[in-house]
Amino acid sequence: MMRGIFIALGLLSLATPALAVEFAPSAGGYIEFTMPSNNIGCVYRDEEGSGLVLECDRVAPSYLRVRLFQDGKPKVYRNVGDASCCGATNYFDYGTSWKKGPFSCASTKSGLRCNNGDHGFTLNRSGVKTY
């Protein structure tokens, strides 16, 4: 019987949701956040003509950018001309989640995971995976 209780407690701990965080928008109306590693940073904004976009940059081992619009699959850019990552003072702590508009993200020690409901990406030092 004790074994069953321990198994149930273990399953409950896996189902525990991440702590949700909110970030205040800048004077320009966009939201920026940076992972604790200072290797990944994101900007959420309403891009004129394209709608809502979440743009996340990874610095190392090679600079790249992922852009996820409110609809559709993410796009990965490996030749970024305006590399500007990771100056935000909003830290997206590990074990937390964030949601704004159609986007939701989770911060873990193994990287960043974001989606727009149908499509998304994971981003870390090892690479980027889109779906």
Region roles according to the model:
Residues 14, 36, 50, 79-80, ...:
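Processing junctions and N-termini across compartments
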Residues 16-20:
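Sec/Tat signal peptide C-region and signal peptidase I cleavage site
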Residues 28-44, 93-100, 104-106:
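Extracellular glycan-recognition/adhesion modules and their associated mucin-like linkers
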Residues 40, 54, 83-84, 103, ...:
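Extracellular secreted precursors and ectodomains with disulfide-bonded cysteine-rich loops/domains
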Residues 44, 58, 87-88, 107, ...:
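Disulfide-rich extracellular modules and peptides
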